[in-house]
UniProtKB/Swiss-Prot annotation:
PANTHER family: DUAL SPECIFICITY MITOGEN-ACTIVATED PROTEIN KINASE KINASE 5, DUAL SPECIFICITY MITOGEN-ACTIVATED PROTEIN KINASE KINASE 5-RELATED
Originating gene: MKK3
Name of the protein in its database record: Mitogen-activated protein kinase kinase 3
Effect of inactivating the gene: More sensitive to Pseudomonas syringae pv. tomato DC3000 infection. Hypersensitivity to abscisic acid (ABA) in germination and root elongation. Short roots with abnormal twisting (e.g. leftward skewing) in media containing microtubule-disrupting drugs (e.g. oryzalin).
GO molecular function: ATP binding; MAP kinase activity; MAP kinase kinase activity; protein kinase activity; protein serine kinase activity; protein tyrosine kinase activity
Keyword Cell cycle: no
Post-translational modification Phosphoserine, affected residues: 69, 235
Single GO biological process annotation from the record: response to herbivore
Localisation: Nucleus; Cytoplasm
Expression sites (tissue/organ): Mostly expressed in leaves, and, to a lower extent, in roots, seedlings, flower buds, flowers and siliques.
Species this protein is from: Arabidopsis thaliana (Mouse-ear cress)
Length: 520
Protein backbone atom coordinates (compact mmCIF):
# COMPACT_ATOMS: atom_id res chain seq x y z
CA UNK A 1 0.00 0.00 0.00
CA UNK A 2 2.88 2.35 0.72
CA UNK A 3 4.08 2.01 -2.86
CA UNK A 4 0.59 2.76 -4.16
CA UNK A 5 0.25 5.88 -2.01
CA UNK A 6 3.70 7.05 -3.07
CA UNK A 7 2.78 6.59 -6.73
CA UNK A 8 -0.45 8.54 -6.32
CA UNK A 9 1.44 11.33 -4.56
CA UNK A 10 3.90 11.56 -7.46
CA UNK A 11 1.06 11.67 -9.96
CA UNK A 12 -1.25 13.98 -7.98
CA UNK A 13 -0.81 16.94 -10.38
CA UNK A 14 -1.96 14.69 -13.21
CA UNK A 15 -4.72 12.73 -11.51
CA UNK A 16 -8.36 13.78 -11.72
CA UNK A 17 -10.55 11.99 -9.18
CA UNK A 18 -13.50 11.91 -11.54
CA UNK A 19 -11.84 11.33 -14.91
CA UNK A 20 -8.70 9.39 -14.00
CA UNK A 21 -5.30 10.18 -15.48
CA UNK A 22 -5.18 13.43 -17.39
CA UNK A 23 -2.83 14.61 -20.10
CA UNK A 24 -3.81 18.25 -19.67
CA UNK A 25 -0.32 19.23 -18.65
CA UNK A 26 0.86 18.59 -22.21
CA UNK A 27 -1.33 21.34 -23.63
CA UNK A 28 0.07 24.55 -24.98
CA UNK A 29 -1.35 27.25 -22.66
CA UNK A 30 -1.47 29.63 -25.61
CA UNK A 31 -3.40 27.25 -27.86
CA UNK A 32 -6.59 28.74 -29.31
CA UNK A 33 -8.64 28.77 -32.48
CA UNK A 34 -10.69 31.17 -34.57
CA UNK A 35 -13.57 30.18 -36.83
CA UNK A 36 -14.25 32.66 -39.64
CA UNK A 37 -17.56 33.27 -41.40
CA UNK A 38 -15.97 31.93 -44.58
CA UNK A 39 -15.51 28.47 -43.10
CA UNK A 40 -11.80 28.72 -42.28
CA UNK A 41 -10.40 27.47 -38.98
CA UNK A 42 -7.26 29.21 -37.70
CA UNK A 43 -5.45 27.07 -35.15
CA UNK A 44 -3.02 29.26 -33.26
CA UNK A 45 -0.14 28.27 -31.03
CA UNK A 46 2.76 30.35 -29.79
CA UNK A 47 4.87 27.21 -30.13
CA UNK A 48 3.84 26.22 -33.66
CA UNK A 49 2.56 29.35 -35.43
CA UNK A 50 -0.73 29.47 -37.32
CA UNK A 51 -2.38 26.72 -39.36
CA UNK A 52 -5.35 27.77 -41.49
CA UNK A 53 -7.78 25.01 -42.51
CA UNK A 54 -10.77 25.23 -44.83
CA UNK A 55 -12.57 22.97 -47.28
CA UNK A 56 -9.85 23.55 -49.89
CA UNK A 57 -6.88 22.54 -47.78
CA UNK A 58 -4.26 23.73 -45.30
CA UNK A 59 -2.05 26.80 -45.17
CA UNK A 60 0.86 26.85 -42.73
CA UNK A 61 2.06 30.30 -41.59
CA UNK A 62 5.24 31.22 -39.77
CA UNK A 63 3.74 34.16 -37.89
CA UNK A 64 1.55 33.79 -34.82
CA UNK A 65 -0.74 36.54 -36.17
CA UNK A 66 -3.58 35.50 -38.45
CA UNK A 67 -3.68 38.78 -40.37
CA UNK A 68 -0.05 38.61 -41.54
CA UNK A 69 -0.74 36.92 -44.86
CA UNK A 70 2.75 37.67 -46.12
CA UNK A 71 4.12 35.19 -43.58
CA UNK A 72 2.54 32.27 -45.44
CA UNK A 73 5.01 29.44 -45.72
CA UNK A 74 3.39 26.35 -47.23
CA UNK A 75 0.04 25.44 -48.79
CA UNK A 76 -1.32 21.89 -49.03
CA UNK A 77 -4.15 21.64 -51.54
CA UNK A 78 -6.22 18.68 -50.47
CA UNK A 79 -9.90 19.63 -50.77
CA UNK A 80 -12.82 17.91 -49.09
CA UNK A 81 -14.83 17.73 -52.33
CA UNK A 82 -11.92 15.89 -53.97
CA UNK A 83 -12.13 12.98 -51.54
CA UNK A 84 -14.20 9.85 -52.07
CA UNK A 85 -14.57 8.65 -48.46
CA UNK A 86 -15.26 5.05 -47.48
CA UNK A 87 -15.85 3.22 -44.19
CA UNK A 88 -13.73 3.36 -41.05
CA UNK A 89 -10.61 1.21 -40.79
CA UNK A 90 -9.84 2.12 -37.20
CA UNK A 91 -10.50 4.51 -34.34
CA UNK A 92 -8.74 5.79 -31.27
CA UNK A 93 -9.43 7.98 -28.28
CA UNK A 94 -9.30 11.19 -30.30
CA UNK A 95 -9.87 10.27 -33.95
CA UNK A 96 -11.46 8.01 -36.54
CA UNK A 97 -9.49 6.73 -39.55
CA UNK A 98 -11.23 6.05 -42.87
CA UNK A 99 -10.07 4.97 -46.30
CA UNK A 100 -10.53 7.50 -49.08
CA UNK A 101 -9.61 7.98 -52.73
CA UNK A 102 -8.10 11.33 -53.66
CA UNK A 103 -9.94 11.99 -56.91
CA UNK A 104 -7.29 14.09 -58.76
CA UNK A 105 -4.63 11.37 -58.55
CA UNK A 106 -6.82 8.30 -57.91
CA UNK A 107 -4.76 7.27 -54.90
CA UNK A 108 -6.14 5.47 -51.86
CA UNK A 109 -5.27 7.37 -48.67
CA UNK A 110 -6.08 7.17 -44.97
CA UNK A 111 -8.18 10.04 -43.60
CA UNK A 112 -7.74 10.74 -39.90
CA UNK A 113 -10.67 12.81 -38.63
CA UNK A 114 -10.37 14.90 -35.46
CA UNK A 115 -12.93 17.14 -33.73
CA UNK A 116 -11.45 20.63 -33.24
CA UNK A 117 -13.78 21.78 -30.46
CA UNK A 118 -12.07 19.78 -27.70
CA UNK A 119 -8.89 21.47 -26.57
CA UNK A 120 -6.85 18.33 -25.93
CA UNK A 121 -7.67 16.91 -29.36
CA UNK A 122 -6.88 20.28 -30.93
CA UNK A 123 -3.44 20.28 -29.32
CA UNK A 124 -2.77 16.73 -30.54
CA UNK A 125 -3.84 17.80 -34.03
CA UNK A 126 -1.40 20.72 -34.00
CA UNK A 127 1.41 18.48 -32.82
CA UNK A 128 0.75 15.86 -35.48
CA UNK A 129 0.37 18.39 -38.30
CA UNK A 130 3.58 20.13 -37.27
CA UNK A 131 5.52 16.86 -37.16
CA UNK A 132 4.19 15.69 -40.52
CA UNK A 133 4.79 19.05 -42.22
CA UNK A 134 8.38 19.20 -41.04
CA UNK A 135 9.28 15.58 -41.77
CA UNK A 136 8.21 15.15 -45.41
CA UNK A 137 8.70 11.87 -47.22
CA UNK A 138 11.05 10.18 -44.75
CA UNK A 139 11.00 6.46 -45.47
CA UNK A 140 10.43 5.54 -41.82
CA UNK A 141 7.40 7.82 -41.29
CA UNK A 142 3.97 7.78 -42.91
CA UNK A 143 3.66 10.34 -45.72
CA UNK A 144 1.53 13.45 -45.23
CA UNK A 145 -0.67 14.58 -48.14
CA UNK A 146 -2.58 17.49 -46.64
CA UNK A 147 -5.54 18.39 -44.45
CA UNK A 148 -8.88 20.15 -44.69
CA UNK A 149 -11.76 21.36 -42.51
CA UNK A 150 -15.39 20.23 -42.89
CA UNK A 151 -17.74 22.89 -41.41
CA UNK A 152 -20.73 20.54 -41.31
CA UNK A 153 -19.03 18.08 -38.97
CA UNK A 154 -16.62 20.41 -37.19
CA UNK A 155 -13.81 18.01 -38.03
CA UNK A 156 -10.37 18.43 -39.52
CA UNK A 157 -9.23 15.55 -41.71
CA UNK A 158 -5.55 14.67 -42.11
CA UNK A 159 -4.76 12.82 -45.35
CA UNK A 160 -2.03 10.23 -44.83
CA UNK A 161 -0.38 7.46 -46.79
CA UNK A 162 -2.58 4.35 -46.65
CA UNK A 163 -0.59 1.50 -45.09
CA UNK A 164 -2.47 -1.41 -46.60
CA UNK A 165 -0.73 -4.10 -44.54
CA UNK A 166 -2.11 -2.79 -41.26
CA UNK A 167 -0.22 -2.51 -37.98
CA UNK A 168 1.99 -4.94 -36.09
CA UNK A 169 -0.92 -5.24 -33.64
CA UNK A 170 -3.13 -6.41 -36.53
CA UNK A 171 -0.51 -8.97 -37.56
CA UNK A 172 -0.24 -10.31 -34.00
CA UNK A 173 -3.98 -10.94 -33.92
CA UNK A 174 -3.50 -13.38 -36.79
CA UNK A 175 -0.04 -14.90 -36.27
CA UNK A 176 0.23 -14.59 -32.44
CA UNK A 177 3.99 -14.00 -32.81
CA UNK A 178 6.45 -12.87 -35.50
CA UNK A 179 9.66 -14.81 -36.38
CA UNK A 180 12.99 -13.29 -35.34
CA UNK A 181 14.41 -12.80 -38.87
CA UNK A 182 11.26 -10.88 -39.86
CA UNK A 183 11.40 -8.78 -36.69
CA UNK A 184 15.06 -7.99 -37.31
CA UNK A 185 14.27 -6.58 -40.75
CA UNK A 186 11.17 -4.76 -39.51
CA UNK A 187 12.86 -3.10 -36.57
CA UNK A 188 15.92 -2.23 -38.63
CA UNK A 189 13.73 0.03 -40.74
CA UNK A 190 11.68 1.28 -37.80
CA UNK A 191 14.86 2.24 -35.96
CA UNK A 192 15.88 4.34 -38.95
CA UNK A 193 12.62 6.27 -38.61
CA UNK A 194 13.06 6.62 -34.86
CA UNK A 195 16.65 7.76 -35.34
CA UNK A 196 15.38 10.48 -37.68
CA UNK A 197 12.75 11.59 -35.15
CA UNK A 198 15.31 11.77 -32.35
CA UNK A 199 18.44 12.93 -34.12
CA UNK A 200 17.09 15.26 -36.82
CA UNK A 201 13.66 16.35 -35.66
CA UNK A 202 14.50 16.26 -31.92
CA UNK A 203 11.14 14.64 -31.14
CA UNK A 204 10.14 12.14 -28.47
CA UNK A 205 7.27 10.14 -29.98
CA UNK A 206 5.83 9.13 -26.57
CA UNK A 207 3.43 6.51 -27.92
CA UNK A 208 5.51 3.78 -29.57
CA UNK A 209 3.44 0.56 -29.56
CA UNK A 210 2.52 -2.19 -32.05
CA UNK A 211 -0.66 -0.35 -33.09
CA UNK A 212 1.43 2.67 -34.17
CA UNK A 213 3.95 0.63 -36.17
CA UNK A 214 2.44 0.16 -39.63
CA UNK A 215 3.50 -1.74 -42.73
CA UNK A 216 2.37 -1.76 -46.35
CA UNK A 217 2.10 -4.66 -48.78
CA UNK A 218 5.48 -3.74 -50.25
CA UNK A 219 7.02 -4.64 -46.91
CA UNK A 220 7.82 -1.08 -45.82
CA UNK A 221 7.29 -0.48 -42.06
CA UNK A 222 6.63 3.07 -40.84
CA UNK A 223 5.89 4.94 -37.63
CA UNK A 224 2.59 6.80 -37.29
CA UNK A 225 0.48 8.80 -34.82
CA UNK A 226 2.51 11.83 -33.79
CA UNK A 227 -0.35 13.50 -31.90
CA UNK A 228 1.42 13.45 -28.54
CA UNK A 229 5.04 13.68 -29.65
CA UNK A 230 7.11 16.38 -27.96
CA UNK A 231 9.85 18.56 -29.38
CA UNK A 232 13.15 19.05 -27.58
CA UNK A 233 15.58 21.85 -28.30
CA UNK A 234 18.58 19.51 -28.35
CA UNK A 235 19.69 16.02 -27.44
CA UNK A 236 20.14 16.98 -23.77
CA UNK A 237 16.67 18.50 -23.25
CA UNK A 238 13.99 16.72 -21.23
CA UNK A 239 10.17 16.45 -21.23
CA UNK A 240 8.04 16.78 -18.10
CA UNK A 241 4.54 15.69 -19.14
CA UNK A 242 2.45 12.58 -18.63
CA UNK A 243 0.87 11.49 -21.93
CA UNK A 244 0.81 8.34 -24.03
CA UNK A 245 -0.26 4.73 -23.65
CA UNK A 246 0.42 3.63 -20.05
CA UNK A 247 0.93 0.03 -21.21
CA UNK A 248 4.21 0.85 -22.97
CA UNK A 249 5.31 3.70 -20.69
CA UNK A 250 8.84 3.79 -19.29
CA UNK A 251 9.59 3.81 -15.53
CA UNK A 252 10.84 7.40 -15.51
CA UNK A 253 7.63 8.59 -17.15
CA UNK A 254 5.49 6.67 -14.66
CA UNK A 255 7.44 8.30 -11.81
CA UNK A 256 6.60 11.66 -13.41
CA UNK A 257 10.31 12.39 -13.75
CA UNK A 258 11.74 14.36 -16.63
CA UNK A 259 12.43 12.13 -19.62
CA UNK A 260 13.88 12.18 -23.11
CA UNK A 261 14.54 9.91 -26.10
CA UNK A 262 15.30 6.80 -23.96
CA UNK A 263 11.58 6.69 -23.09
CA UNK A 264 10.88 5.73 -26.72
CA UNK A 265 13.58 3.05 -26.57
CA UNK A 266 11.83 1.41 -23.60
CA UNK A 267 8.51 1.43 -25.50
CA UNK A 268 10.21 0.01 -28.60
CA UNK A 269 11.70 -2.80 -26.50
CA UNK A 270 8.31 -3.71 -25.05
CA UNK A 271 6.78 -3.67 -28.54
CA UNK A 272 9.52 -6.01 -29.82
CA UNK A 273 9.08 -8.29 -26.79
CA UNK A 274 5.35 -8.58 -27.49
CA UNK A 275 5.85 -9.16 -31.22
CA UNK A 276 8.48 -11.85 -30.67
CA UNK A 277 6.94 -13.78 -27.78
CA UNK A 278 3.30 -13.16 -28.59
CA UNK A 279 2.69 -11.98 -25.02
CA UNK A 280 2.80 -8.65 -23.22
CA UNK A 281 5.21 -9.18 -20.31
CA UNK A 282 3.11 -7.46 -17.62
CA UNK A 283 -0.41 -8.09 -16.29
CA UNK A 284 -2.29 -5.31 -18.04
CA UNK A 285 -5.92 -6.15 -17.24
CA UNK A 286 -5.94 -5.14 -13.56
CA UNK A 287 -5.98 -1.39 -14.10
CA UNK A 288 -3.36 1.26 -14.87
CA UNK A 289 -2.15 1.73 -11.28
CA UNK A 290 -1.39 -1.98 -10.85
CA UNK A 291 0.38 -2.02 -14.20
CA UNK A 292 2.51 0.98 -13.29
CA UNK A 293 3.49 -0.59 -9.97
CA UNK A 294 4.67 -3.70 -11.85
CA UNK A 295 6.78 -1.62 -14.21
CA UNK A 296 8.33 0.28 -11.30
CA UNK A 297 8.86 -2.57 -8.82
CA UNK A 298 9.29 -5.78 -10.83
CA UNK A 299 12.57 -6.69 -12.55
CA UNK A 300 12.62 -5.78 -16.22
CA UNK A 301 11.14 -8.61 -18.30
CA UNK A 302 13.42 -10.78 -20.40
CA UNK A 303 12.46 -13.37 -23.04
CA UNK A 304 12.92 -17.09 -22.22
CA UNK A 305 16.55 -17.65 -23.20
CA UNK A 306 15.91 -21.28 -24.13
CA UNK A 307 13.37 -20.18 -26.78
CA UNK A 308 15.03 -17.13 -28.30
CA UNK A 309 18.43 -16.25 -29.71
CA UNK A 310 21.02 -14.52 -27.51
CA UNK A 311 20.92 -11.54 -29.87
CA UNK A 312 17.15 -11.11 -29.46
CA UNK A 313 17.36 -11.38 -25.67
CA UNK A 314 20.29 -8.96 -25.56
CA UNK A 315 18.40 -6.38 -27.65
CA UNK A 316 15.38 -6.59 -25.33
CA UNK A 317 17.55 -6.37 -22.21
CA UNK A 318 19.30 -3.28 -23.57
CA UNK A 319 16.02 -1.49 -24.29
CA UNK A 320 14.39 -2.38 -20.96
CA UNK A 321 17.04 -1.00 -18.62
CA UNK A 322 15.32 0.73 -15.68
CA UNK A 323 17.94 3.48 -15.81
CA UNK A 324 17.21 5.55 -18.94
CA UNK A 325 20.86 6.59 -19.20
CA UNK A 326 21.81 2.92 -19.58
CA UNK A 327 19.61 2.41 -22.65
CA UNK A 328 21.23 2.65 -26.09
CA UNK A 329 20.16 5.24 -28.62
CA UNK A 330 18.29 4.37 -31.81
CA UNK A 331 21.54 4.87 -33.75
CA UNK A 332 23.40 2.48 -31.46
CA UNK A 333 20.66 -0.14 -31.77
CA UNK A 334 21.06 -0.08 -35.55
CA UNK A 335 24.46 -1.69 -34.96
CA UNK A 336 23.18 -4.26 -32.45
CA UNK A 337 23.87 -7.93 -33.39
CA UNK A 338 20.13 -8.68 -33.48
CA UNK A 339 19.79 -6.15 -36.31
CA UNK A 340 23.02 -6.95 -38.16
CA UNK A 341 22.74 -10.74 -37.79
CA UNK A 342 19.95 -11.07 -40.37
CA UNK A 343 21.05 -8.35 -42.82
CA UNK A 344 22.44 -10.84 -45.35
CA UNK A 345 19.36 -13.08 -45.24
CA UNK A 346 17.30 -10.48 -47.11
CA UNK A 347 13.97 -11.33 -45.50
CA UNK A 348 11.17 -10.62 -47.97
CA UNK A 349 8.89 -8.51 -45.81
CA UNK A 350 6.42 -8.03 -48.68
CA UNK A 351 5.87 -11.79 -48.99
CA UNK A 352 5.51 -12.10 -45.22
CA UNK A 353 2.88 -9.35 -44.95
CA UNK A 354 0.94 -10.55 -47.98
CA UNK A 355 0.74 -14.03 -46.47
CA UNK A 356 -0.91 -12.81 -43.27
CA UNK A 357 -4.33 -11.61 -44.35
CA UNK A 358 -7.05 -13.06 -46.55
CA UNK A 359 -6.18 -11.84 -50.07
CA UNK A 360 -9.73 -12.53 -51.26
CA UNK A 361 -11.32 -9.98 -48.96
CA UNK A 362 -8.58 -7.45 -49.63
CA UNK A 363 -9.11 -7.85 -53.39
CA UNK A 364 -12.88 -7.51 -53.06
CA UNK A 365 -12.54 -4.33 -51.01
CA UNK A 366 -10.18 -2.89 -53.61
CA UNK A 367 -12.57 -3.79 -56.45
CA UNK A 368 -15.50 -2.19 -54.59
CA UNK A 369 -13.61 1.06 -53.99
CA UNK A 370 -12.27 1.39 -57.53
CA UNK A 371 -15.67 0.57 -59.05
CA UNK A 372 -17.41 3.18 -56.91
CA UNK A 373 -14.68 5.67 -57.77
CA UNK A 374 -14.93 5.16 -61.54
CA UNK A 375 -18.72 5.19 -61.89
CA UNK A 376 -19.11 8.08 -59.43
CA UNK A 377 -16.80 10.07 -61.70
CA UNK A 378 -18.62 8.98 -64.86
CA UNK A 379 -22.12 9.71 -63.52
CA UNK A 380 -21.09 12.64 -61.32
CA UNK A 381 -20.59 16.36 -61.73
CA UNK A 382 -18.84 17.81 -64.75
CA UNK A 383 -16.30 19.72 -62.64
CA UNK A 384 -14.70 16.44 -61.51
CA UNK A 385 -15.02 14.43 -64.72
CA UNK A 386 -11.79 15.80 -66.22
CA UNK A 387 -9.84 13.91 -63.54
CA UNK A 388 -10.84 10.66 -65.26
CA UNK A 389 -8.23 11.30 -67.96
CA UNK A 390 -5.38 10.61 -65.53
CA UNK A 391 -6.79 7.14 -64.81
CA UNK A 392 -5.13 6.06 -68.07
CA UNK A 393 -1.57 5.95 -69.38
CA UNK A 394 -0.33 6.29 -72.95
CA UNK A 395 -0.41 2.48 -73.32
CA UNK A 396 -3.94 2.02 -71.94
CA UNK A 397 -6.56 0.61 -74.33
CA UNK A 398 -10.34 1.20 -74.30
CA UNK A 399 -12.62 -0.90 -76.53
CA UNK A 400 -16.26 -0.12 -77.37
CA UNK A 401 -18.50 -0.99 -80.29
CA UNK A 402 -15.67 -2.53 -82.31
CA UNK A 403 -13.39 0.48 -81.90
CA UNK A 404 -10.13 0.56 -79.95
CA UNK A 405 -8.76 3.74 -78.43
CA UNK A 406 -5.19 3.95 -77.14
CA UNK A 407 -3.70 6.50 -74.77
CA UNK A 408 -5.26 8.80 -72.19
CA UNK A 409 -6.31 11.52 -74.66
CA UNK A 410 -8.13 9.20 -77.09
CA UNK A 411 -9.77 7.22 -74.31
CA UNK A 412 -10.97 10.29 -72.42
CA UNK A 413 -12.44 11.74 -75.63
CA UNK A 414 -14.28 8.49 -76.43
CA UNK A 415 -15.63 8.16 -72.89
CA UNK A 416 -16.73 11.81 -72.87
CA UNK A 417 -18.76 11.21 -76.06
CA UNK A 418 -20.48 8.21 -74.46
CA UNK A 419 -21.06 10.17 -71.27
CA UNK A 420 -22.64 13.08 -73.18
CA UNK A 421 -24.95 10.67 -75.00
CA UNK A 422 -26.09 9.10 -71.72
CA UNK A 423 -26.54 12.48 -70.03
CA UNK A 424 -28.94 13.92 -72.61
CA UNK A 425 -30.07 17.52 -72.81
CA UNK A 426 -32.33 17.56 -69.74
CA UNK A 427 -31.92 16.25 -66.17
CA UNK A 428 -34.91 13.99 -66.74
CA UNK A 429 -33.01 12.31 -69.60
CA UNK A 430 -29.82 11.44 -67.67
CA UNK A 431 -28.97 7.75 -67.49
CA UNK A 432 -26.82 6.43 -64.65
CA UNK A 433 -25.24 3.07 -63.87
CA UNK A 434 -26.60 0.55 -61.38
CA UNK A 435 -23.96 -2.13 -60.75
CA UNK A 436 -25.86 -5.32 -59.93
CA UNK A 437 -23.01 -7.84 -60.08
CA UNK A 438 -19.31 -7.37 -59.49
CA UNK A 439 -16.64 -10.00 -60.07
CA UNK A 440 -12.92 -9.67 -59.47
CA UNK A 441 -9.73 -11.70 -59.66
CA UNK A 442 -6.05 -10.89 -59.07
CA UNK A 443 -3.91 -9.57 -61.89
CA UNK A 444 -0.13 -9.33 -61.84
CA UNK A 445 1.59 -7.76 -58.86
CA UNK A 446 -1.05 -5.96 -56.84
CA UNK A 447 -3.51 -5.48 -59.70
CA UNK A 448 -7.08 -6.67 -60.18
CA UNK A 449 -9.44 -7.54 -63.04
CA UNK A 450 -12.96 -6.22 -62.39
CA UNK A 451 -16.09 -7.16 -64.31
CA UNK A 452 -19.18 -5.03 -63.64
CA UNK A 453 -22.64 -6.05 -64.87
CA UNK A 454 -25.71 -3.88 -64.43
CA UNK A 455 -28.42 -1.63 -65.77
CA UNK A 456 -28.98 1.94 -66.87
CA UNK A 457 -31.80 3.84 -65.16
CA UNK A 458 -32.94 7.46 -65.28
CA UNK A 459 -31.47 9.20 -62.25
CA UNK A 460 -28.77 11.52 -60.95
CA UNK A 461 -26.40 9.23 -59.06
CA UNK A 462 -24.57 5.97 -59.60
CA UNK A 463 -25.75 3.04 -57.44
CA UNK A 464 -24.19 -0.27 -56.48
CA UNK A 465 -25.95 -3.35 -55.10
CA UNK A 466 -24.47 -5.64 -52.47
CA UNK A 467 -22.96 -5.41 -49.00
CA UNK A 468 -19.40 -4.47 -49.89
CA UNK A 469 -17.46 -1.31 -49.11
CA UNK A 470 -19.75 1.68 -48.67
CA UNK A 471 -18.96 5.27 -49.64
CA UNK A 472 -20.07 8.40 -47.80
CA UNK A 473 -22.83 10.22 -49.66
CA UNK A 474 -23.73 7.18 -51.76
CA UNK A 475 -27.24 5.98 -50.85
CA UNK A 476 -27.71 2.37 -49.90
CA UNK A 477 -29.45 0.51 -52.68
CA UNK A 478 -31.55 -1.40 -50.15
CA UNK A 479 -32.83 1.81 -48.56
CA UNK A 480 -34.12 3.18 -51.88
CA UNK A 481 -36.69 0.41 -52.13
CA UNK A 482 -37.27 0.31 -55.90
CA UNK A 483 -37.12 -2.48 -58.43
CA UNK A 484 -34.34 -2.04 -60.99
CA UNK A 485 -36.17 -4.06 -63.64
CA UNK A 486 -39.12 -1.67 -63.62
CA UNK A 487 -36.84 1.32 -64.28
CA UNK A 488 -34.29 -0.31 -66.56
CA UNK A 489 -33.71 1.34 -69.93
CA UNK A 490 -30.63 -0.63 -70.93
CA UNK A 491 -27.89 -2.98 -69.77
CA UNK A 492 -24.12 -2.83 -69.69
CA UNK A 493 -21.13 -5.06 -69.08
CA UNK A 494 -17.70 -3.59 -68.47
CA UNK A 495 -14.34 -5.13 -67.73
CA UNK A 496 -11.37 -3.27 -66.27
CA UNK A 497 -7.78 -4.46 -66.01
CA UNK A 498 -6.39 -2.42 -63.12
CA UNK A 499 -2.65 -2.25 -62.50
CA UNK A 500 -0.89 -0.83 -59.47
CA UNK A 501 1.42 2.16 -59.79
CA UNK A 502 4.77 2.87 -58.19
CA UNK A 503 3.13 4.38 -55.10
CA UNK A 504 1.11 2.41 -52.56
CA UNK A 505 -2.60 2.94 -53.21
CA UNK A 506 -2.05 4.35 -56.71
CA UNK A 507 -3.82 2.53 -59.60
CA UNK A 508 -4.48 3.04 -63.31
CA UNK A 509 -6.65 1.36 -65.95
CA UNK A 510 -4.51 -0.62 -68.39
CA UNK A 511 -7.40 -2.08 -70.37
CA UNK A 512 -11.14 -1.45 -70.49
CA UNK A 513 -13.91 -3.08 -72.53
CA UNK A 514 -17.49 -1.77 -72.60
CA UNK A 515 -20.63 -3.45 -73.96
CA UNK A 516 -24.03 -1.71 -73.97
CA UNK A 517 -27.25 -3.52 -74.93
CA UNK A 518 -30.97 -2.73 -75.21
CA UNK A 519 -30.51 1.02 -74.85
CA UNK A 520 -33.77 2.73 -75.87
Amino acid sequence: MAALEELKKKLSPLFDAEKGFSSSSSLDPNDSYLLSDGGTVNLLSRSYGVYNFNELGLQKCTSSHVDESESSETTYQCASHEMRVFGAIGSGASSVVQRAIHIPNHRILALKKINIFEREKRQQLLTEIRTLCEAPCHEGLVDFHGAFYSPDSGQISIALEYMNGGSLADILKVTKKIPEPVLSSLFHKLLQGLSYLHGVRHLVHRDIKPANLLINLKGEPKITDFGISAGLENSMAMCATFVGTVTYMSPERIRNDSYSYPADIWSLGLALFECGTGEFPYIANEGPVNLMLQILDDPSPTPPKQEFSPEFCSFIDACLQKDPDARPTADQLLSHPFITKHEKERVDLATFVQSIFDPTQRLKDLADMLTIHYYSLFDGFDDLWHHAKSLYTETSVFSFSGKHNTGSTEIFSALSDIRNTLTGDLPSEKLVHVVEKLHCKPCGSGGVIIRAVGSFIVGNQFLICGDGVQAEGLPSFKDLGFDVASRRVGRFQEQFVVESGDLIGKYFLAKQELYITNLD
